[in-house]
């Protein structure tokens, strides 16, 4: 998810700091209105904090990106990631990629939901560069962690736990 756009700005700045703005971009997916009804039914524990993810509209996040001078390397897509990710990858001509020809060095999953995470991983997998990273950002283990572990097992990928952390 994109939420307020903090990671869009962070990754946008990293793209620029490393001089990759001619070849790389950040793409983000979010409903901008909390979890979908389907997600809430599948993951009832998400309902308690659903209001926390209704903090900014897509336009507000884009304004934040332009205010932080990264709007030119950021694209945001609104809707259910399970639907939007495969559609965008197959059909959308991005700022730095052609439809159905994108290649990614990093996929950063921050959605807290198993189905959104696993469906996004399945959609991005054919577009990953060799030795690409799949990273999750989950404060309380749940859907993302489970999706990553299931996906890694299905595809015989190694899961790295940085430092002395006991979770992926």
Residue ranges of each PLM-predicted region?
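S-adenosylmethionine/decaboxylated-SAM
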Residues: 2-168
């Amino acid at each position: 998810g994109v939420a307020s756009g903090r990671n869009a700005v962070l990754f946008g700045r990293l793209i620029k700091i490393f001089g990759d703005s001619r070849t790389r971009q950040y793409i983000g997916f979010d409903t901008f209105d909390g979890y979908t009804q389907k997600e809430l039914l599948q993951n009832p524990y998400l309902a308690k904090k659903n209001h926390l993810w209704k903090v900014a509209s897509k336009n507000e996040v884009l304004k934040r990106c332009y205010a932080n001078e990264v709007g030119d390397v950021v694209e945001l897509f609104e809707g259910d990631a399970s639907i939007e990710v495969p559609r965008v990858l197959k059909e959308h001509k991005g700022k730095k990629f052609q439809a159905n020809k994108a290649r990614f060095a990093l996929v950063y999953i921050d959605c807290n939901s198993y189905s959104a995470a696993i469906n996004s991983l399945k959609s991005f997998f054919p577009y990953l560069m060799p030795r690409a990273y799949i990273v999750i950002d989950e404060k309380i283990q749940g859907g993302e962690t489970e999706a990553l572990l299931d996906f890694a097992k299905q595809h015989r990928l190694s899961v790295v736990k940085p430092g002395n952390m006991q979770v992926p």
